[in-house]
């Protein structure tokens, strides 16, 4: 009952069947199930992608509250970088199973290096419609880019910010 209360569910929710829950309630049940084991790490793979924006915010706020209360770490896997920015201290950008760029949330958002990272960030809608209308979105086509993920090494950008690429790509992207 304590765990259910912690995630915002009433004790009677323990007697319900999965089809009787809303999407947000299902996520809360999933979080409660994970918390019962008192984990040091929770892997949350696309845990909010199927929820509407207001419910996403509620679930992410709940996760942040639990993290502050328990010290639990999250590996938060998502395509929605605006939510990733809100919940994460550090970000790793993966594409086709390759870790392309890592750094603090600030480093990645303020100075993205890899073209794939830049394309993901340019897909985040801006709240100012005038700025949004003028912005040119970056697209990324791995095949057309000529980038071979199997080549290259980890290049230090600054602080804890690294990007995996060849020396030539690093020089070109950091101009």
What are these regions (language model features)?
Residues 1-12, 121:
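Conserved ABC ATPase "signature" region
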Residues 17-21, 25:
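Conserved ABC ATPase signature
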Residues 31, 43, 59:
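Hydrophobic anchor residue at the start of the ABC signature
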Residues 36-40:
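A short, proline-enriched helix->beta-strand linker immediately N-terminal to the Walker B motif
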Residues 84-86:
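A short, surface-exposed alpha-helical micro-motif characterized by mixed small hydrophobic
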Residues 105-175:
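Short catalytic/signature loops enriched in Gly
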């Amino acid at each position: 009952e304590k765990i259910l209360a912690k995630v915002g569910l009433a004790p009677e929710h323990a007697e319900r069947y999965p089809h009787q829950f809303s999407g947000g309630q299902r996520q809360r049940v999933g979080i409660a199930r994970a918390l019962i084991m008192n984990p040091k790490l929770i892997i949350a793979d696309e845990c909010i992608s199927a929820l509407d924006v207001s419910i996403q915010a509620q679930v992410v706020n709940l996760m942040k509250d639990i993290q502050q209360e328990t010290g639990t770490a999250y590996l938060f896997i998502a395509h929605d970088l605006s939510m990733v920015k809100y919940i994460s201290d550090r970000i790793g950008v993966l594409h086709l199973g390759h870790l392309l760029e890592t750094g603090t949330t600030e480093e990645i958002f303020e100075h993205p290096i890899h073209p794939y990272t830049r394309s993901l960030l340019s897909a985040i809608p801006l709240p100012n419609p005038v700025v949004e209308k003028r912005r040119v979105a970056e697209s990324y086509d791995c095949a057309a880019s000529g980038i071979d993920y199997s080549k290259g090494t980890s290049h230090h950008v600054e602080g804890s910010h690294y990007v995996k690429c060849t020396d030539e790509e690093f020089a070109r992207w950091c101009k």
